């Protein structure tokens, strides 16, 4: 960025948001409406649980031009960084990316546990460590073997990345 660029940190960590998403949306609209060139940097792909869609709607409704530069989703990048392919022609021919942290205001879960447990080879749950007990319980209850290999990866692609190789049946206890 240029020396005179204004930089606003709006990063988020679990239960620690420096700015709420509606406020981020308003800030993007405000700065763009003032004629400023706004660059919103995000980790991963802004359209995979990255709130890019929400930001785009706000900018569209305000009649402001914008563009997105695709990123590499952490759903693949983190697994790759740990040396784990999400597909492999001899082992896994499909994968799904699922939120591990559904919006608590929507009430009932909309995750298709039976479909995920039996119809998809590799399951990638993002933001799921805090809900790991619920995730593994639902997978096993819907037909996924407790002996299925699993990896729990925290702080993906960062120097402090930690990868735990475990099973679906023991993952929650192993992380606790």
Regions found by a protein language model. Give the residues of each.
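Short, glycine-/small-residue-rich phosphate/pyrophosphate-handling segment
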Residues: 79-101
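A contiguous loop/helix-start segment that scaffolds small-molecule binding in enzyme catalytic cores
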Residues: 23, 33-39, 51, 57, ...
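Class I S-adenosyl-L-methionine
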Residues: 1-72, 169-172
């Amino acid at each position: 960025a240029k020396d005179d660029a204004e930089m606003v940190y709006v990063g988020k960590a679990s239960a620690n948001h420096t700015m709420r998403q509606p406020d981020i949306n308003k800030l993007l609209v405000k700065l763009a409406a003032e004629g400023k060139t706004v660059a919103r940097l995000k980790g991963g792909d802004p359209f995979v649980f990255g709130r890019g869609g929400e930001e785009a709607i706000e900018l569209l409704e305000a009649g402001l031009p914008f563009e997105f530069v695709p990123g590499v989703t952490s759903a693949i990048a983190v697994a790759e960084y740990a040396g784990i392919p999400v597909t492999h022609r001899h082992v896994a021919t499909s994968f799904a990316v699922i939120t591990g942290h559904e919006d608590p205001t929507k009430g009932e879960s909309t995750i298709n546990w039976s479909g995920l447990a039996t119809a998809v080879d590799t399951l990638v749950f993002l933001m799921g460590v805090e809900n790991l007990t619920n995730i593994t319980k639902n997978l096993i209850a819907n037909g996924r073997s407790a002996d299925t290999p699993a990896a729990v990866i925290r702080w993906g692609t960062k120097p402090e990345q930690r990868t735990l190789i475990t099973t679906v049946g023991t993952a929650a206890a192993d992380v606790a």
